[in-house]
Amino acid sequence: MSLSLWQQCLARLQDELPATEFSMWIRPLQAELSDNTLALYAPNRFVLDWVRDKYLNNINGLLNTFCGADAPQLRFEVGTKPVTQTLKTPVHNVVAPTQTTTAQPQRVAPAARSGWDNVPAPAEPTYRSNVNVKHTFDNFVEGKSNQLARAAARQVADNPGGAYNPLFLYGGTGLGKTHLLHAVGNGIMARKPNAKVVYMHSERFVQDMVKALQNNAIEEFKRYYRSVDALLIDDIQFFANKERSQEEFFHTFNALLEGNQQIILTSDRYPKEINGVEDRLKSRFGWGLTVAIEPPELETRVAILMKKADENDIRLPGEVAFFIAKRLRSNVRELEGALNRVIANANFTGRAITIDFVREALRDLLALQEKLVTIDNIQKTVAEYYKIKIADLLSKRRSRSVARPRQMAMALAKELTNHSLPEIGDAFGGRDHTTVLHACRKIEQLREESHDIKEDFSNLIRTLSS
């Protein structure tokens, strides 16, 4: 039995799984083959349980394919394989991009560290954590739209500076990126109370750099940011067109990565789509793991409302939560704001929270939402996105270049409007409701299988909800 068996499995899994899933769950595994047993070592219990639950059948199937009746037994363990073994020689196209193409700045010895905003500075800087203790993994509502992002963030909290460095989270406004940043910070400090974890908005980094330049304290600024254990920066897209800030962050990024210090970044778009940011930075943003957070699906929106109501000791009937979630779809922040308004109105008036009461309390918000998202608007937006004509969406043409956008538009109409399936079908050239149902199921399936379709859906949701 060849020691290349696990390499063969890696190559096949890389072809079969979405890139994000492969990077997050399969790449960190180490393997040891002995006595007809293939031992897979996971970095922690969380990864072990996830792999065993989600990918056990995939791996066993590949072992049977490659070995037949001689397939080894699988064994999962937490930790690393014995150092005497040399099995983990990954397939070349599985290896993460090399990070040695650019000269990196020299690290400052610990004895020389100092705080940048006090001159003369103390020997050891005072770190402004800025991590919000209220945002934890426990009160982050998980759903299909954010499951991978939460899992990746949890991994980083348990193993900072490890495989997912940097971690880049992207998605629209109000979807939970900032919550996860704080949750990671809290997780790291819970495991290591003395960890130097710094959270900030990207604009604060720029402001601190400007202040350091004004005070002739740029070296202290560098030492401060390059000596943290974890740097969590929100909305990195605000570095756009700030050349000096990008230059300084470029060297800070290199220094932190060289020291195995964790970097987590968030943005409202995929790294390569950030305009005004240097290519060398955008390339580095993708060195670790990049994960999208999508707008929450209906079930997650309902769960968010129920959890928020419970935190406020408010009894929210399920049908009321469903009514709100069905009509407000863009992001978590909008949902929570709507619920806060409902709760405030109920407290002021002493009335029970019913669907009629919610319809009255949120009448302007609901009217605006219905006005913004119409089937006509969806058709126009989808046609422009795919560079086809609206008439094509309504036609009987079945070529993939037309059929797929038509299915996407139908799925968006079901997701973003309150129209019934027959009404949606009628708006798309008089199609039957079963055609609409098939389109919705097809797009849901493709979102699981195709990164491009998933990105298209997210981009269109963002455009239509903005």
Curated annotation (Swiss-Prot):
Gene3D superfamilies cross-referenced by the UniProt entry: 1.10.1750.10, 1.10.8.60, 3.30.300.180, P-loop containing nucleotide triphosphate hydrolases
The keyword Nucleotide-binding is assigned to this record: yes
Pfam families recorded: Bac_DnaA (PF00308), Bac_DnaA_C (PF08299), DnaA_N (PF11638)
Coiled-coil regions, chain positions: none
PROSITE patterns: DNAA (PS01008)
GO molecular function: ATP binding; ATP hydrolysis activity; DNA replication origin binding; lipid binding
SMART domains per the UniProt record, alphabetical: AAA, Bac_DnaA_C
Similarity comment text for this entry: Belongs to the DnaA family.
Protein name per its UniProtKB record: Chromosomal replication initiator protein DnaA
Organism: Salmonella enteritidis PT4 (strain P125109)
Gene field: dnaA
